[in-house]
Amino acid sequence: MGEKPNRIGRANISYINHDHIFLPSFQPSYPSRQLHPLISSQNKVHSSIVHLPKVASPSSPETQQHSQAPLFITHIMSGLPQALASGFAARVREGGTTLYINTTPMLRSARHNTAVNYAEFEEDFDANDFEDDDDDDQSQRESRDGSEEAEGDEDGTKKEEQDKFAGLKAPLVSNEPKRAAPPVRPVMYPQEVLEELSQVKEPTLIPIRVAVENIDVFRVQDFFLWDADEKILTPEQFATLTCADLDVPIGYSAQMSAQIKKQLAEYTAAPALPKDVEVHVIVELAVTVDKIVYEDKFEWDLSGEYATPQEFARTVVQDLGLGQEFYPAITYQLYETLGKLQKAWLERSIPLDVDNRAAFGLEAGLRVDQDNLGESWVPRVEEMTPEEMQKREMERDRSSRRLKRESARMAEVPYVDLDSLYSRKRRRRFDEDSRSGSPMW
C-alpha cells in the first residue's frame, strides 16, 4: 500500500485505490505546528472513515480544478467531538468560588514548628538555663546548616525554581500523580422518550444541597433545584458529571448521588393552598457564602402570584451587589423556608394573621414603627471572622432545636374547628350550677 501525501484543506490525505481515506494516525498539518481544536484535542484523534469521490493524481490538472476542499473539511469537522479539554477545574481551584474549597493546612517552617509555652516555666526560673539554651541553639544551628547544605546539593534544581518566585507565592511542589477525570459518554434516549419529555409540564422543584469533604484536602458544596419528575438525568449521572467537571476522584460520586436521593425521598409534597386566597407569612433568611453573611426579613405570599424564589434571589443579588454564588444559595434557602412555612400554615402551627405593622390596618404598605423605624425589616450584609461565624452557627442550631420542640408541642394539641364551635347548633343555655364565680355572670 503506497501513500502519496497531498495537501487539501490543510489535512494529510493518503490515496488507497484512488479513494480518500483517513488513516488512524491522522494528524492535521499546520505551519505553526499546532493542532486545530476542532480536529484534535488532548491527543484524541477522530478515527472515523470518510469516503470521498474519486479524484485524479495530485499532479494532474484535475486536482487544481478541484474546488470541494472547504466542503471536505466542513464535513469532517461536523462529526468531531467538541470541548474535550476544559480549564474549569483549574479556575475553580484558584479560590474565587466556594464550590471547591481547598482545606489543605498551611505548614510552618522547621524554624517555627516548636511552640513553647512559657507559662509552664514561670516558677522554675534559673539563670543557668539560658547558658544551656545557648549551647543547644549553637549545636542545632550547626546541624541545621549541615543538613541544609546536604539537601541543597540534592535538590538544587528545586531551589532554583523556587527562587524564581521572589516576592511572590511559590507554587506547592507535590509528588502525587495527577489523575485525569474519567471520560463521560453521552446517554442516548429513544425518540419516543424525547417526544414525551418535550411536552411542557409544570416542574416540581426540590431544593438540594450537596456537600462532600476530604479532610485536609478539599470541600465541595453546591446548591441547586431538582425536578421531582426528572427522567433524563439521574442522580448517578449528575454526580459523575460533577466529579468530572471539578476533577474530583470518581469515588465521591456515590456520596453525592446518595445525598441527592435522600433529599428527594424525604421530600413530601404539601397539600395545595386555598385558591384565590393570599396567605402571608413572615420569612427570615440567613445565607452565608464564604465570609459574607446576608440576612433579611420580609413578608411573602405563599400563593406565589407575584414572584418566585428565583426572581427574588436575582433581584437581591443585583440590588445589593452580591456575588453570583448568592443566587443559588438564596434560592435554595428560600425554597426550603417556604416549604416549611406552608406545611406549618396548613397544620395551623403558626398564626394565621400576620402583624406586619402596616399603616391604617392595611395588608401591605408603609410600616409604622416609631421606636426602631423598621430596623428589623432591612436587609443586612456583613463580613465576619471564622470565630463569629462559628458562634452564629451554634446560635442558629440552638434556635432551630427550640423551634422543633415548639412545633412538636403544638402538634400534640388537638385541632379545634372554630366554625363548628361557635355555630348555633353547638350553643346551649348554661344553668346556674354550671356558672362559675366570675363577676361577668
UniProtKB/Swiss-Prot annotation:
It comes from the Eukaryota. Residues 124-183, 383-407 are annotated as: Disordered. Its main location: nucleus. It is found in: Nucleus. The keyword Transcription applies. Residues 138-147, 155-166 have a biased composition (Basic and acidic residues). It holds the Pfam family SNF5. One of its GO terms (cellular component) is RSC-type complex. Keywords: Cell cycle, Chromatin regulator, Nucleus, Transcription, Transcription regulation. One of its GO terms (biological process) is chromatin remodeling. Residues 124-137 have a biased composition (Acidic residues). One of its GO terms (molecular function) is transcription coregulator activity. Belongs to the SNF5 family. Part of the chromatin structure-remodeling complex (RSC) which is involved in transcription regulation and nucleosome positioning. RSC is responsible for the transfer of a histone octamer from a nucleosome core particle to naked DNA. The reaction requires ATP and involves an activated RSC-nucleosome intermediate. Remodeling reaction also involves DNA translocation, DNA twist and conformational change. This is Chromatin structure-remodeling complex subunit SFH1.
